[in-house]
């Protein structure tokens, strides 16, 4: 069983190499979307949550990127513990975790588990990063060889259609899943 997930946050970390336990370094979770698929690629279910801010605010600058304002999150948001309980329930049934930029998303979720004293359910799972594992397939030149493809670049390489990254976890995770199953079909994964 495959669990695809994506996050939107209050910003970026100050130090990308900091451990997940450095809670002051890792931004807060604003949106979590996830999809659960069987081994054959059939979607079983999915969820999308906006997190109710508790102890943090969503800046105007960041809300321009993902369109989730502090006011919207306060009115529509769900408490973090409820969201993580729901996620952890699906996580416990999953064999593989899939994300585009796994190292970022797993640290965001891991830090939130720690903030509310929950066991990090991501540990011990097999992880597949569509960004890292499609680098040689996409062959996009960067300053030090091939660069990691953006989700939109991977989508274009696979389907020859433009996808504007939405910075909406629900939209992005559906595109990630579409790309993943195509990468499996053509034996890149």
Region locations from a protein language model:
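Short acidic, Gly/Ser-rich segments with clustered Asp/Glu that frequently serve as metal-coordination loops
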Residues: 7-15, 20
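Extreme N-terminal starter segment of soluble prokaryotic enzymes
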Residues: 1-3
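Catalytic-core regions of hydrolytic enzymes
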Residues: 74-93
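Metal-dependent phosphoesterase core characteristic of DEDDh/y 3'-5' exonuclease domains
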Residues: 15, 26-70, 88-189
């Amino acid at each position: 069983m495959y669990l695809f997930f994506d996050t939107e946050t209050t910003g970026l970390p100050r130090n990308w190499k900091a451990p997940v336990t450095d809670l002051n370094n890792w931004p807060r979770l604003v949106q979590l979307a996830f999809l659960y698929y069987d081994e054959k690629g059939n979607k079983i279910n999915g969820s999308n949550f906006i997190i109710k801010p508790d102890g943090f605010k969503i800046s105007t600058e960041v809300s321009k990127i993902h369109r989730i304002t502090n006011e919207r999150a306060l009115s529509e948001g769900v408490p973090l513990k409820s969201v993580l309980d729901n996620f952890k329930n699906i996580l416990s049934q999953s064999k593989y975790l899939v994300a585009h930029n796994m190292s970022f998303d797993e640290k965001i979720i891991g830090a939130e588990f720690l903030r509310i004293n929950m066991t990090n359910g991501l540990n011990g799972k097999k992880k597949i990063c569509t960004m890292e594992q499609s680098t040689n397939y996409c062959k996009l030149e960067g300053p030090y060889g091939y660069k990691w493809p953006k989700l939109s670049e991977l989508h274009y390489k696979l389907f020859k259609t433009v996808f504007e990254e939405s910075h909406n976890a629900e939209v992005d995770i559906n595109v990630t899943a579409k790309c993943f199953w195509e990468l499996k079909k053509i034996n890149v994964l």
